[in-house]
Amino acid sequence: MNIVLSPIDRLHSEKLIGVYEAWKRTAAGRLAPKREEITPALLKSALPSIWMIDVIDGGRDYRFRIAGDRIIQFMGRRYAGHLLSEFQGQAFFDQMRGILKACTEQKRPLMAGPGRSKMPGREFSELEVVVLPLSEDGQNVTTVFGAMEIRSVPPAPKLPKGQ
């Protein structure tokens, strides 16, 4: 997936639109909601697809906090407690860093995709992501929260011999 951060109004996924709308209602005109305001009841239909990542030192690093079952299945394992820097040099995680950093620095909701996954073994998946800031102090992004829509993309058809 190329990192093309778009205005939030370009979301395709109804699930991601629902997560964004819940975030917007909860933010109620503030920079962002606090982490404790993002509850399972608020997101029940999207829980398998949500994730939350703590911002470390203003964006110098990020720590995986929670991920829904669909995210864990896609990623192949749980990453909770690990730092994003542990996976530096891997295309999928480097791309993730760019998206998280943009949200942290711009202090606004962003979306990426839809586009092909760069996760090894998951190249035939198309991803669309909504990335939303959370703030404990109302001024700085302290956690990044979001959801990911994962769709299977069939391999390209084989051309007939001689073409």
Regions from the PLM with identified roles:
Residues 1-90, 94-163:
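Intrinsically disordered, low-complexity terminal regulatory regions
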